[in-house]
């Protein structure tokens, strides 16, 4: 599913909202998550999961074509850990679509 499909599904389930408004809301949520991660904050959505940033140190890499050693700079990468409710829902028996609500 891509973002435009997500927006469309949410708009379909909420006919009182315009699709443009749903798109603005989804974009605002994603922007806030990215901004928080850029500040070094952790973003936890209970039942869904938690977003955080992991820092990878500089290291020596290797060019797979030539075999030459190349330096790889340190970098920060986004990390997502699923929440308990999501893991349980994903690991249910096939055919069981009960959402627990």
From Swiss-Prot:
The keyword DNA-binding applies. The keyword Hydrolase does not apply. Pfam families: Bac_DNA_binding. CDD domains: IHF_B. It comes from the Bacteria. One of its GO terms (cellular component) is chromosome. One of its GO terms (molecular function) is DNA binding. GO terms for biological process: DNA recombination; regulation of DNA-templated transcription; regulation of translation. Keywords: DNA recombination, DNA-binding, Transcription, Transcription regulation, Translation regulation. Heterodimer of an alpha and a beta chain. Belongs to the bacterial histone-like protein family. This protein is one of the two subunits of integration host factor, a specific DNA-binding protein that functions in genetic recombination as well as in transcriptional and translational control. This is Integration host factor subunit beta. It comes from Rhodopseudomonas palustris (strain BisB5). The lineage of its organism: Bacteria, Pseudomonadati, Pseudomonadota, Alphaproteobacteria, Hyphomicrobiales. The gene is ihfB.
């Amino acid at each position: 599913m891509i973002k435009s499909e997500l927006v469309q599904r949410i708009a379909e389930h909420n006919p009182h909202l315009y699709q443009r408004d749903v798109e603005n809301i989804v974009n605002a949520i994603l922007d806030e998550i990215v901004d928080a991660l850029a500040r070094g904050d952790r973003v936890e959505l209970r039942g869904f999961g938690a977003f955080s940033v992991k820092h990878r140190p500089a290291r020596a890499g290797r060019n797979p074509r030539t075999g030459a050693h190349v330096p790889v700079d340190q970098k920060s990468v986004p990390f997502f850990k699923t929440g308990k409710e999501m893991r349980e829902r994903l690991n249910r028996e096939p055919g069981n679509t009960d959402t627990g609500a």
